[in-house]
């Protein structure tokens, strides 16, 4: 009996979608001033590098953003809905408790059958989802997977907390992964440390028809910074070692777009020149699970990321979770 040839997962297309409403730092400062909260463009840029963010209008849902990003990724990949045999949505802001946001996206796209589910790993979510889809494709359980990161984080922000409300935006990014004979995704590592849950969390829950606990995002910024740069540095080196490449071989580093300070510090630790780091946090702010696919899509469409190049994508977020995916484009 002939042995079945190993299949690999390769990125065939990408897409991104941002809400139409753009809120600059000056816009946000003016809005917060009506609440007697003081901030400014200079204060936000100096600490985060963020200059603006996109915010969804009331009534716009995560599944709607995800669907638009998915359609653009499918167009880019040249695939039809009936070719999609897996949909994974990474989100911490689902439309419903259930069904999954992925099921809603499947219905919106007119896709049928195939595994369809959500992954919740906050800002690491897209890397978790991509690794999951890669495993299914390698195992021969899927051939064409739609992997999406989508969030409306503006719905879980405390707009009276200057330390967090200026950091986040809404949006969605997606990739199509297709089975291929040659490796696209070379290696992936996922990790978590549940003892660090309280440094970044939204602890509310639904019970008996009411939201109980604190429904808003809370963050210990200094603890998150320290954890993020430590684990991402180690994860990058581990995933490169598994793939048999050096960090210097990476053409593009696409980390989770949390804060420009984290991005710059990580680049220095890895000795990756800043011109080889894709940075979109200035325009998008932190879009949680959407940040990595949005950044990848921007860099593919503006011509920076080219076929054949080596790209390292990294996520880090609440849980505390982190992970890396190394891919040949």
Curated annotation (Swiss-Prot):
InterPro entries xref list: ACP_syn_III_C, ACP_syn_III_N, FabH, Thiolase-like
GO molecular-function term, one example from the UniProt record: 3-oxoacyl-[acyl-carrier-protein] synthase activity
Chain intervals for the UniProt region annotation (ACP-binding): 257-261
Compartments (UniProt record): Cytoplasm
Catalyzed reaction equations: malonyl-[ACP] + acetyl-CoA + H(+) = 3-oxobutanoyl-[ACP] + CO2 + CoA
GO biological process terms held by the UniProt record: fatty acid biosynthetic process; secondary metabolite biosynthetic process
Superkingdom of source: Bacteria
Keywords per UniProt: Acyltransferase, Cytoplasm, Fatty acid biosynthesis, Fatty acid metabolism, Lipid biosynthesis, Lipid metabolism, Multifunctional enzyme, Transferase
Main location: cytoplasm
Pfam families: ACP_syn_III, ACP_syn_III_C
Enzyme Commission number(s) of this protein: 2.3.1.180
GO cellular component: cytoplasm
Active site: 123, 256, 286
Function description: Catalyzes the condensation reaction of fatty acid synthesis by the addition to an acyl acceptor of two carbons from malonyl-ACP. Catalyzes the first condensation reaction which initiates fatty acid synthesis and may therefore play a role in governing the total rate of fatty acid production. Possesses both acetoacetyl-ACP synthase and acetyl transacylase activities. Its substrate specificity determines the biosynthesis of branched-chain and/or straight-chain of fatty acids.
Complex and partners: Homodimer.
Protein family per UniProt: Belongs to the thiolase-like superfamily. FabH family.
Protein name: Beta-ketoacyl-[acyl-carrier-protein] synthase III
């Amino acid at each position: 009996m002939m042995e079945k040839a190993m299949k690999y997962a390769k990125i065939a297309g990408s897409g991104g979608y941002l809400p139409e409403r753009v809120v600059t730092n000056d816009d946000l400062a003016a809005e917060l001033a009506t609440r007697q909260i003081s901030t400014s463009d200079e204060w936000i840029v100096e600490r985060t590098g963020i200059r603006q963010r996109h915010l969804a209008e009331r009534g716009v849902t995560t599944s709607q953003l995800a669907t638009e990003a998915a359609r653009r990724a499918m167009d880019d990949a040249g695939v039809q809905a009936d070719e999609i045999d897996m949909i994974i949505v990474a989100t911490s802001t689902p439309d419903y408790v259930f069904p999954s946001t992925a099921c809603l996206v499947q219905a919106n796209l007119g896709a049928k059958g195939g595994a369809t589910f959500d992954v919740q790993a906050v800002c690491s979510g897209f890397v978790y989802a991509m690794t999951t889809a890669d495993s299914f494709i390698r195992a021969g359980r899927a051939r064409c997977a739609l992997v999406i990161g989508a969030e409306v984080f503006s719905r879980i922000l405390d707009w009276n907390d200057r330390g967090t409300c200026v950091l986040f935006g809404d949006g969605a990014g997606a990739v199509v992964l297709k089975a291929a004979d040659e490796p696209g995704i070379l290696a992936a590592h996922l990790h978590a440390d549940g003892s660090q849950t309280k440094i970044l969390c939204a602890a509310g829950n639904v019970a008996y028809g009411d939201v109980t606990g604190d429904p808003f995002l809370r963050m210990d910024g200094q603890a998150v910074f320290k954890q993020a740069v430590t684990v991402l540095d180690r994860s990058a080196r581990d995933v490169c070692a598994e793939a048999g490449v050096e960090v210097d071989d990476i053409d593009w580093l696409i980390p989770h777009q949390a804060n420009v300070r984290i991005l710059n510090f990580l680049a220095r630790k890895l000795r990756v020149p800043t011109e080889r780091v894709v940075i979109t946090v200035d325009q998008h702010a932190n879009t949680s699970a959407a940040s990595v696919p949005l950044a990848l899509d921007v860099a593919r469409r503006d011509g920076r990321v080219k076929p054949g190049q080596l790209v390292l994508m990294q996520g880090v977020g609440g849980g505390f979770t982190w992970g890396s995916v190394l891919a040949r484009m």
